[in-house]
Every structure is written in structure tokens, then in C-alpha cells.
A protein has these predicted regions:
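Short, internal acidic amphipathic alpha-helical interface segments
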Residues: 72-112
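A short acidic-to-branched-hydrophobic micro-motif
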Residues: 56-78
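Short Lys/Arg-enriched helix C-cap and helix-to-coil transition segments
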Residues: 205-211
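Short, surface-exposed recognition loops or helix-turn segments adjacent to catalytic cores
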Residues: 37, 105-107, 145-159
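Charge-rich, low-complexity N-terminal segments
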Residues: 2-53, 178
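Short, aliphatic-rich beta-strand segments
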Residues: 113-118
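Acidic, Ser/Thr-rich low-complexity intrinsically disordered segments
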Residues: 154-204
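Ampiphathic alpha-helical segments that act as solvent-exposed interaction surfaces
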Residues: 87-99, 119-151
């Protein structure tokens, strides 16, 4: 299912294609968030966007009037004690009062903390989408600080990078290609990249190819 919307100029826009182009056409050489190159999966009714530098998965839904960005935190509250949940919900409401456009909500049977923003498809362009994306990520990092979850999300980010490296090894990537990925894509210095790669490949079954 493809969602087409008539923009302000009267032309038809396939938002799945347009947003995917915005997220994948960067160079990873600038500080601008829209210059980051995202891995985007098109699930027809929504897009899944991931970046090795960001410990969150984005889900981008299209409707006739709105583009909705949802950031999954993986933090579920359904089984917490009532006082814990009350404290979390209070902090989320206070965060909502500090941020514009984006809002924290509780979603699903697991009552996961998610962040979402709705954008008007009739007037949406790349700059507005980039501003919304920056707002989403800024709000999420505010949440991390508020709940003192830096270690949790640093570990999640490390696990994502390790999984990506293992997938690339399984696909036949050379050591040079893996180092280039860690240095240019992730932004690590050469020595750190080599240490991480050594640690990963020492545990991987294709080790002989990389010695």
C-alpha cells in the first residue's frame, strides 16, 4: 500500500519514497542530522529507520493527512510497581511540558514508553522533517538523562554496532571494509575501531579470514 498525498503545489507525493530518499542520501560528513545515512526498511504501510549512532529505532507511518514519527525506547512499564510507574509517568509529563511538537506516550499492552510527533503532510518538506527528527532525538536524550539510563543505552548502542559488524562479516565484508565502516560511519578513531574489530572477530567463526 502506497500513500500518495497532494502537496501545496498540487503534485502527488509518494511519502515512503520521499522520506526514504531524505534518510539515505546523506554523506555522514556533516553535523546536520539530515546528512546522516539511515538504514531504511520499507514495510509498505510504514518505514523502519535505524542508524548505528542512534540507540533508538524509528517507525514512520503515512496517512492521508499526517506523517507520524514514532521512536521506540524499549522501556516497558506494565509490570512495574504502582509507585514506580507513577514516578515515571510524572517525569514524562514534566518532560512533555519542556518540549515542543514531540510528546512522550505509553503504548501497547506492555505500556512501552514511546515518543511521537505528527507532521502535516500537505506542507511537509525536508527541512521540517529534519527539524522534527532533531526534536525527537533531543527529547529522547533528555529522557535518558532524566531516568539516568546512560549506561543502558550505551550498551544498547554497542550491541547494535556489534550485530552490524557480525552481519557484514557473514556477508563477506573484508577487514578493510569493516574498519572503514567503524571509522567513517560510526566515527571511531582508528585504534578504537581496530580494538573493537579484533574483539568481535576473535569470537566469530570466520576468524581465519580476518587474521
Amino acid at each position: 500500500m502506497f500513500i500518495y498525498v497532494i502537496n501545496g503545489e498540487g503534485s502527488m507525493v509518494n511519502w515512503n519514497d520521499e522520506i526514504k530518499k531524505w534518510l539515505t542520501s546523506g554523506t555522514d560528513t556533516k553535523e546536520d542530522i539530515m546528512d546522516m545515512v539511515w538504514n531504511v526498511k520499507d514495510e509498505k504501510t510504514y518505514l523502519i529507520a535505524e542508524n548505528p549512532k542512534i540507540p533508538f529505532t524509528l517507525y514512520i507511518y503515512n496517512s492521508e493527512k499526517f506523517i507520524r514519527i514514532i521512536a521506540s525506547t524499549g522501556l516497558n512499564t506494565a509490570l512495574l510497581e504502582p509507585l514506580q510507574r507513577l514516578d515515571i509517568y510524572r517525569k514524562l509529563l514534566l518532560l512533555n511540558d519542556k518540549i515542543d511538537m514531540t510528546k512522550f506516550v505509553i503504548s501497547g499492552t506492555n505500556e512501552e514508553i514511546i515518543l511521537k510527533v505528527d507532521l502535516d503532510a500537505a506542507s511537509l518538506d525536508k527541512n521540517e522533517f529534519g527539524d522534527a527528527l532533531m526534536g525527537v532525538l533531543t527529547s529522547l536524550y533528555m529522557m535518558i538523562r532524566e531516568f539516568q539510563l546512560e549506561d543502558e543505552f550505551n550498551k544498547r548502542l554497542t550491541d547494535r554496532i556489534v550485530n552490524m559488524i557480525q552481519e557484514k562479516i557473514a556477508e563477506g565484508a573484508t577487514r578493510e571494509e569493516l574498519l572503514e565502516f567503524l571509522v567513517k560511519k560510526i566515527g571511531l578513531d582508528q585504534k578504537t575501531a581496530e580494538n573493537i574489530l579484533n574483539e568481535i572477530t576473535n569470537k566469530f567463526e570466520y576468524l581465519p579470514e580476518y587474521q
